[in-house]
Amino acid sequence: MSYIVDLQVRGSSLRVIKCMFREDEQISSLHSGSDSKQNSNKKLGEFLNLLKAVVKRKLESFPKDRLKTSIITGQELMREGQGSIEIKDPPTEAQQHLIRSLAKVLLHQFSSINGKVNTVNEGQDNLFLSLFVKKISIEQQSTSHVSIKLNFHEKINLGQHIDSILDSEETNESDTYHMGSVDEFIIYPFCCLEEQDELKNGSILSTEFDKIDLELDEDDGFEGETLNNCINSVGNFDIPLSKQTLNLVNISYLPGTTFEGQWESLYFGNNIKERLYSYATISLKIARFKQTGDSNQEDITTLITNNKLLLVHGPPGTGKTTLCKALCQKLSVRREFSDGSDTIDTNYKGIIIELSCARIFSKWFGESSKNISIVFKDIEELLKVNEGRGIFICLLIDEVEAIASSRTNLSSRNESTDGIRVVNTLLTQLDRLKKYHNFLALATSNLLDSLDDAFVDRADGVFYVGNPTAEGILHILKVCIEEMITSGIILFHARSTGVKFFNKYQDILRKIAIKCSTVDISGRTIRKLPLMCLSEYFRTFPVDDDEFVLALAMSARKLSAARK
């Protein structure tokens, strides 16, 4: 079985380690004259390998049931592990000394036995994890997304296997060739940008700006504006976007705390998350493969259609936009499309540019399509700046039907030709940006049938997200209730004994989920159910766990009756 593990490192502890490496290398460079920054990065890479090895060893000790899709917080690890300690954020001076000392000891042991942790005792493991791990997110890979491996006999009979697949009318996504017998943990350490104090305004400005032609074409709508005066501060970074573009989009840097935990909180059937992630990763990998491959090979973009556009559609409130943003967070954490040589640093790994369709439209004729051209021109400059740095740019268009409506329908309704011009401009600009290996476009829609056929045809993958099933509702309730217990809103009496709330009330919550699923309720509405419950039946906090579950059942009954 294969597991993807996203390892969120405690930012304050990581800063102590980075500072220690810098101090050591500055002293060393005075004597040897070596590049202290390069040596410091190398040591940081060794430290992260050590951390991954310790986490892997810990996960291998867990029972199979716990390795299913779940989140393990640093607090849980601290409560469970003998030898763990709780540290402040940021650590005290004494705790910083402990962090430095333990890291040096374990790094020495780790390097002396060629990257193994067998000689490290469990107490050291637990102490190490409590100092450096903030959260571990575990995602079990579905069998349909594990690489296909054929044995010798299957290769000889390959034709027969293919005939049986093509002749079958059923779509079976769990064929027999996929599974391995040994557990595999693919671990991706990361630290959210907000947790790194080293961030300084303008820290990502680099010499790449000098390589870009600063003079923009006059017909691009900038009226003589150049990249020099298009550089603006957004958050902690300077990026080459004009003020006009910044008025039309929202910018998010990745990985960010805003999006952390969203991927795990979402539950969909048919492996939609895994499929969407696979499509996005392969799209970026194919583009990068062409860039880093043999210069004499034929352009792969002429052989494989890769428009860098994924479309997610479904009813309102099903989590389409959240899914897209969470996908980008995971891409920035796992970075499977990059060369994998970078360590945790203060630079962003990706940017989400969320296009506001409502702001794109103007009352002046021709201005709407001009706004789209300006935004895409700025995005192109941003792509050029980050192209060689392994940083991807995602354009997110929410409710894309506003700017990609069917031109046939617009013409038949005698709509203004400005709407048609907007669609034409959007398609042209998407075609223009697909050549960049670090570009990805995500679009969401509530009305797939209203979209222009040419836009839908450009999508490399079209994914339907419907209202949650009973299993999906159960997952949503579980996530919401766990947050309420953690925040102290619900008083769970058995928590001190190690019993999980979900284990105690599993049968009851499942019945509530089945009741809600009979009336086809959106995920957004289900997330409101605990708030409805508290508002209608309680006046003070915390609330008793048994009383909360009873009130939740009553609220579910009311909600179901109102939707019939």
Curated annotation (Swiss-Prot):
GO terms for cellular component: chromosome; nucleolus; nucleus. InterPro entries: AAA+_ATPase (IPR003593), ATPase_AAA_core (IPR003959), P-loop_NTPase (IPR027417), Pch2-like (IPR044539). Keywords: ATP-binding, Chromosome, Meiosis, Nucleotide-binding, Nucleus. It is found in: Nucleus, Nucleolus; Chromosome. One of its GO terms (molecular function) is ATP binding. The keyword NAD does not apply. Induction: Induced at the onset of meiosis I and reaches a maximum level during pachytene (at protein level). ATP binds at residues 314-321. GO terms for biological process: meiotic DNA double-strand break formation; meiotic recombination checkpoint signaling; reciprocal meiotic recombination. PANTHER family: PACHYTENE CHECKPOINT PROTEIN 2, PACHYTENE CHECKPOINT PROTEIN 2 HOMOLOG. Required for the pachytene checkpoint, the meiotic checkpoint that prevents chromosome segregation when defects in recombination and synaptonemal complex formation occurred. Represses meiotic recombination in the rDNA, probably by excluding the meiosis-specific protein HOP1 from the nucleolar region. Belongs to the AAA ATPase family. PCH2 subfamily. This is Pachytene checkpoint protein 2.
